[in-house]
């Protein structure tokens, strides 16, 4: 029998028609309207308390969780350090516990303790966390002023990158730099380490090594911060034109996102301030160079002449025969020259000159030609006086000259002849008296 016939209503009876079917589904209740299930005290993992999400602390009740709670919620860093030690000894998330403890020690000014803790317990950490531990160790070295150890660690990191073991064989890696997550390649990481090495050697006054590291870093990646630091390095080596050229390039470069970076602005201001300070001292240095240019002693000191070679030119000068004779009246010296415009002083000794004497009145001739004031009296000379002095100096300079220079033997013979003549005259006087 057909099933439709069985469902027919008897005569005089009518069935209520069924509701029309639609394809619409019932909307889900929003999460804010739902009731939370009751908490279960048996298992903490089943709790859905957002407290750890709001305060950015891990959930649970382990030594590391208690240490983070003391650090971030209770704001008790000393208690947090002791709890981090407990977590490290218990083996509870040793990587995070060691790094967080070192950060807290750095904030408390206990960087040396943080360095020793990392060196003692980093072997317990995984291989993947060693790079971040090295970065934290570099910050602690910088904070505590241990620049030499920082340079050694940076050299080790650079060598690791050059051997291809820095990123675990990968070409790029996501890193957190200055609070931002960035994708950094091996070349960018190498440039960053070279820049840090240049800055460390700049603090150690190794300016040549610092320049090499900065130029290598700029060859990998152009960075304005490194350009400013390289300019500072060149100024330390007295290469001012090159430093000014670099600063001009930085100033004239187009505005980029890097221009608003705080380290770049600080480096540029520091370099400009140092350049202004050097240029302010430059006129004084030029004046002192001009003042000491004619000083033979200063020139000799600049040439680094040894003490024994100062009088080497005079070592072959023979001594006067009269100096070895017992009855000699004194040494032979040149006659004292008259110096114009110079005050006479009593008891002035004659100076023995071996060099070529300057023309008489050369300095005074220069003064008169320039028409300058008289050095000692500070009076302006009139034109008649200047003409008179010109004639006087010229006549004196063209005075009688010796026909020829006499040797020491001729001088000795003349002295002996004079003594013999004196003895003969004294003998004649004695004979006449008798």
UniProtKB/Swiss-Prot annotation:
Motif extent (Nuclear localization signal 1): 34-37
SMART domains: TPR
Domain of life where this protein originates: Eukaryota
GO cellular component: nucleus
Motif Nuclear localization signal 2 location, chain numbering: 377-380
Bias (Polar residues): 310-326
Deletion consequences: Sterile plants with abnormal formation of polyads during microsporogenesis, tetrads with more than four pools of chromosomes, after male meiosis, due to an unusual and abnormal cell division without further DNA or chromosome replication after meiosis I and II, and leading to collapsed pollen in flattened anthers. Chromatin recondensation and stretching after meiosis II characterized by a dense microtubule network connecting haploid nuclei in the tetrad stage rearranged into four bipolar spindles as chromatids recondense, as if haploid nuclei entered a third meiotic division.
TPR repeat residue numbers: 95-131, 133-164, 191-224, 241-274
Tissue: Expressed at low levels mostly in floral organs during meiosis. Also barely detectable in leaves, stems and roots.
Coarse class of the protein's main subcellular location: nucleus
PROSITE patterns linked to this entry: TPR, TPR_REGION
A biological process from GO: male meiotic nuclear division
Keywords: Cell cycle, Cell division, Coiled coil, Developmental protein, Meiosis, Nucleus, Repeat, TPR repeat
Stored Gene3D superfamilies: Tetratricopeptide repeat domain
Function as written in the Swiss-Prot or TrEMBL entry: Essential for male fertility, especially for microspore and pollen grain production. Involved in the regulation of cell division after male meiosis I and II to facilitate exit from meiosis and transition to G1.
Family: Belongs to the MS5 protein family.
Name of the featured protein: Protein POLLENLESS 3
Source species of the chain: Arabidopsis thaliana (Mouse-ear cress)
Gene: MS5
């Amino acid at each position: 029998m057909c099933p439709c016939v069985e469902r027919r209503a008897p005569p005089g009876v009518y069935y209520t028609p069924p509701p029309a079917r639609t394809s619409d589904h019932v909307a889900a209740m929003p999460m804010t309207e739902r009731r939370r299930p009751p908490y279960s005290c048996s298992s903490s993992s089943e709790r859905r308390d957002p407290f750890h999400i709001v305060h950015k602390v891990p959930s649970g009740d382990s030594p590391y969780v208690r240490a983070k709670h003391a650090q971030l919620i209770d704001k008790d860093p000393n208690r947090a350090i002791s709890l981090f030690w407990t977590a490290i000894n218990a083996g509870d998330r040793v990587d995070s516990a060691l790094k967080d403890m070192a950060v807290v020690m750095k904030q408390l000014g206990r960087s040396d303790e943080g360095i020793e803790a990392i060196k003692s317990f980093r072997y317990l950490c995984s291989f993947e966390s060693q790079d971040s531990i090295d970065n934290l160790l570099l910050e602690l070295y910088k904070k505590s002023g241990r620049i030499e150890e920082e340079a050694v660690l940076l050299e080790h990191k650079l060598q690791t990158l050059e051997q291809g073991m820095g990123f675990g064989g990968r070409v790029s890696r996501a890193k957190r730099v200055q609070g931002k997550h960035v994708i950094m390649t091996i070349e960018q990481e190498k440039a960053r380490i070279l820049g840090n090495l240049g800055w460390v050697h700049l603090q150690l006054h190794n300016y040549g090594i610092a320049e090499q590291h900065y130029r290598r870093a700029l060859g990998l990646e152009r960075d304005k911060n490194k350009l400013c630091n390289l300019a500072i390095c060149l100024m330390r080596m007295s290469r001012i034109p090159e430093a000014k050229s670099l600063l001009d390039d930085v100033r004239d470069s187009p505005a980029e996102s890097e221009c608003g970076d705080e380290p770049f602005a600080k480096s540029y201001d520091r370099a400009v301030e140092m350049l202004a300070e050097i240029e302010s001292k430059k006129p004084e240095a030029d004046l002192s160079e001009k003042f000491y240019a004619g000083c033979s002693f200063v020139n000799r000191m600049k040439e680094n002449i040894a003490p024994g070679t100062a009088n080497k030119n005079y070592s072959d000068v023979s001594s006067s025969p009269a100096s070895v004779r017992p009855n000699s009246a004194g040494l032979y010296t040149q006659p004292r020259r008259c110096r114009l415009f110079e005050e006479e002083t009593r008891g002035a000794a004659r100076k023995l000159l071996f060099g070529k004497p300057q023309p008489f009145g050369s300095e005074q001739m220069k003064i008169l030609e320039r028409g300058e004031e008289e050095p000692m009296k500070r009076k302006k000379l009139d034109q008649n006086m200047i003409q008179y002095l010109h004639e006087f100096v010229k006549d004196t300079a063209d005075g009688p000259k010796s026909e020829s220079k006499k040797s020491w033997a001729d001088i000795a013979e003349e002295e002996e002849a004079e003594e013999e003549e004196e003895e003969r005259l004294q003998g004649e006087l004695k004979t006449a008296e008798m």
